[in-house]
A protein has these predicted regions:
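Domain-level signal for soluble alpha/beta catalytic cores
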Residues: 1-278
Length: 278
């Protein structure tokens, strides 16, 4: 994919490449696969002159993710990412335009047979609320809201870009009708900070928690962003995430099938220990 290219268009133009990537994660032990639709709202696709293929791109993504399981049990999560701007009154994008774009994407994902919609890497509760309403209107069987927090310069405190705390985010998502409270990506969010954020979610709501941290902190090498945390290093934080209340654990930027394979091993080991103690 060339820099600035439209990866979501690969669902139609290079489906076997997308399938190979997702199959690698399924083979590594993933129970859930997120569709290749993070930037597949019409607003985002229009920037690549792909808007007219919005529905086809989203439907194809669901089919590819389902195929990646190869007949094994698994959950397909239809991904809705940010639309890449700010809604009025903070920005110049009309709320009605975002409602229409998210509504179209949610309807395409639901009609294609997703098991849940995940609305991820959100920093604005207003935008998240529009996406949740779109998922509800489309009849999504399960809705996961997932916020992206940034670690502040001093200490371990985190906020979204718009200043939202984990407690505020958890309360909003629960009230808005999410079935799962998620956190993913962000700046300076490693496994330890992710576990702390999950505990803060838990202090507000008893809903299930999903955590997808990055593979450590990014560094710039030869004009490329590199995440150096190895599968073993990242997996060492899985028990703390489980103890904090996370029930769905994955990886975001920098994570690979090798990371997920180690996650799977740790989760299975913890489950075995829990059964042995029961």
């Amino acid at each position: 994919l060339p820099p600035g290219g439209c990866g979501e268009a690969w669902n139609l133009d290079a489906p076997e490449k997308v399938l190979a990537i997702q199959r690698a994660y399924a083979d590594a032990g993933s129970d859930c696969l997120i569709t290749n639709t993070f930037g597949a709202s019409r607003i985002m696709l229009d920037r690549h002159d792909e808007g007219e293929r919005t529905q086809a791109i989203n439907r194809a993504a669901v089919e590819i993710a389902r195929r990646a399981f190869g007949g094994r049990p698994g959950y397909v999560l239809g991904d809705i990412g940010p639309f890449g701007g700010l809604m009025e009154p903070y920005g110049d994008i009309p709320v009605a335009l975002v409602e229409k774009a998210f509504g179209e994407q949610a309807e395409a994902l639901v009609s294609a047979g997703i098991d849940a919609i995940i609305i991820e890497t959100q920093t604005s509760l207003e935008e998240l609320g529009v996406a949740i309403a779109a998922a509800q209107a489309a009849g999504a069987p399960c809705i996961i809201g997932s916020m992206a927090f940034d670690r502040l310069r001093e200490g371990d405190e985190v906020r979204t870009m718009m200043g939202t705390s984990p407690e505020q985010a958890a309360a909003f998502m629960a009230e808005a009708g999410c079935h799962v409270l998620g956190l993913n990506c962000g700046s300076g969010i490693d496994m330890r900070i992710a576990a702390d954020t999950a505990r803060r979610y838990r202090s507000v709501s008893g809903l299930p928690i999903m955590a997808q941290p990055n593979a450590g902190l990014p560094v710039l090498e030869n004009l490329k962003v590199i995440y150096r945390e190895t599968p073993d290093e990242m997996a060492a934080g899985v028990p703390a995430l489980l103890d904090a209340g996370a029930r769905i654990i994955g990886g975001c930027c920098g994570s690979t099938p090798a990371h997920i394979r180690r996650f799977r091993e740790i989760v299975d080991h913890v489950r075995h220990q829990d059964r042995a103690r029961a």
